[in-house]
Amino acid sequence: MKIWIDADACPRVVKDIVFRASERLKVPVCLVANTDLSRAHTSLITSVRVKAGFDVADDYIAENAEACDLVITADIPLAARVVEKGGVALDPRGELYTEENVGERLSYRNLMAELRTDGLLVGGPAQLGLTDRNRFASALDRLLTKMVREHRSQ
């Protein structure tokens, strides 16, 4: 079992929450980004630096994450790929991507992108607030505890 973080756009506070959970539960973490993140390394935390380019980090995670792994990402197309493979994906606001909701979230994302392209909508999602951080920490704790228990009982 491993936690993968789509690290290019992941807020620092979310990474810190994941790092603390990783240490507490002894679950390895792999940060994937097109920048050097080696300073974050510990015995449980590693990183992979991919080439710069559209979806390169996403492709790496989708190809390497296994069904027993957890992926932290705000990228809905990546989450859809992970869920399709039977994996688990969580966004930085604590929302779990599931087979039931990922298609709808992908459609909504595509609509918003189209509205932005047409100039009918400006900006992106709101900045991560304290409520979001707390929701993420709670969701991560519940999910990881369950996943670790299931993984270690096999």
Curated annotation (Swiss-Prot):
InterPro entries per the UniProt record, alphabetical: UPF0178
One Pfam family from the record: DUF188
Superkingdom field: Bacteria
Similarity annotation: Belongs to the UPF0178 family.
Protein name according to UniProt: UPF0178 protein Gbem_2221
Organism of origin: Citrifermentans bemidjiense (strain ATCC BAA-1014 / DSM 16622 / JCM 12645 / Bem)
